[in-house]
């Protein structure tokens, strides 16, 4: 069997996607298995699901970010719960066997109730589309450079919220696939650090590349106790405290490690977008 993967930011929104799916429906492609990358919920129709199912696809993948309407508004994800429910119904009607959803915990301004909304949504989908296997992949929010939330840190409560989702969903037969909170912390360490992390990276490379190895190397760098082979005789600057890099919310005036690089949006615009997003703290204010 040949396998063809259709990849793109939003494959199903391509103006000729329907024509392509129809073309692939020809008998001469009976030995071809077709799959698509993550799709927008609003583009999922019974016809699309049927076309994919007829070509060997078993599931669809949708990024929902959160089961909370408010949190999706915060991250500017234009998606409603009804669209998610409709996508699940259409996937099942078209003959697909599973639906994979992806989301996050620990987003700026997220509350416990928002995480409960994610669990509620999955349980509702389980009830309204019986027989459709549900998977939720969930990661911890990690701030990225040149984005409105670049000043935010990793929220420690995210680890507890991952466990809360597991407690609510796994007993109901929903496949929860959380990314490691610990490795998300290391992602944040790398994405938010400056040149002072160089010695830590060298030290980790020369030892165990594990969570414990990263933390041990960072402690050694902070105390100036890295092996001579790591520093190679160079007077390396000490990195800042662990929490200051990973968890602290940086001031708007903080000079960021990447400020010397020109991104698509300037600092003023990013700050404005962050302010707008964080102003959405009252769920009732979205009506």
Mark where each language-model region is.
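Radical SAM enzyme core and accessory elements
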Residues: 171-287
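Flexible, active-site-adjacent loop/turn segments at secondary-structure boundaries
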Residues: 9, 42, 139-140, 147, ...
């Amino acid at each position: 069997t040949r396998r063809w993967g259709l990849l793109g930011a939003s494959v199903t929104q391509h103006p000729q996607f329907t024509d392509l799916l129809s073309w692939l429906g020809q008998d001469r492609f009976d030995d071809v298995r077709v799959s698509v990358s993550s799709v927008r919920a609003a583009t999922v129709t019974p016809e699309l699901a049927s076309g994919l199912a007829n070509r060997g696809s078993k599931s669809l993948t949708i990024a929902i970010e959160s089961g909370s309407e408010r949190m999706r508004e915060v991250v500017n994800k234009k998606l409603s719960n009804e669209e998610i429910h409709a996508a699940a119904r259409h996937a099942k009607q078209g003959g697909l066997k599973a639906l994979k959803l992806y989301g996050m915990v620990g987003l700026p301004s997220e509350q416990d109730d928002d995480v409960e909304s994610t669990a509620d949504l999955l349980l509702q989908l389980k009830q309204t589309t019986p027989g459709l296997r549900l998977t939720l992949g969930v990661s911890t929010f990690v701030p990225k450079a040149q984005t409105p939330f670049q000043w935010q840190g990793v929220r420690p409560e995210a680890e507890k919220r991952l466990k809360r989702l597991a407690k609510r969903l796994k007993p109901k037969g929903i496949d929860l696939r959380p990314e490691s909170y610990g490795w998300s912390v290391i992602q944040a360490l790398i994405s938010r650090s400056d040149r002072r992390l160089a010695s830590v990276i060298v030290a980790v490379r020369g030892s165990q590349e594990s969570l414990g190895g990263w933390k041990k190397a960072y402690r050694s760098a902070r105390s100036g106790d890295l092996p001579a082979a790591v520093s190679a005789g160079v007077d390396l600057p000490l990195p800042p405290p662990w929490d200051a890099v990973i968890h602290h919310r940086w001031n708007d005036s903080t000079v960021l490690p990447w400020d010397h690089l020109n991104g698509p949006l300037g600092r003023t615009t990013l700050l404005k977008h962050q302010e707008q997003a964080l102003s959405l703290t009252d769920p009732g204010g979205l009506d």
